[in-house]
């Protein structure tokens, strides 16, 4: 089901991260904002059965770790802790205001969960990670990624 979902994106407009046309990108056809390339490699553990896709990471100044969903105010890792371990602090280092990267990676690997994003290069139209403020310069080749994941369900 998920593989079919990912494959159905071929030729479709990405819904959450849209190619933005703005006044800044209309000046001589080039945006004044720099192009950012994705800072992380896809996290695709052996036996990956589920591929979770976000849009693009926040700017590095907002990171609490060098991995997906790095902003300490983002609840992704708290939700995973609560759902799978009944402990929203399972992956949280409250003292350092960070997430515990090694346990997160071990959990994802054990569960066969891969992570990446729908864009590999973007321009930030504003200083945010909000989908509406991202201009996708290069979308991720999801078909190529899915072909590398034969156990994807």
Language-model features: where?
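Polybasic, lysine-enriched low-complexity intrinsically disordered terminal tails
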Residues: 15-25
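A polyanion-binding, active-site-adjacent surface
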Residues: 28-153
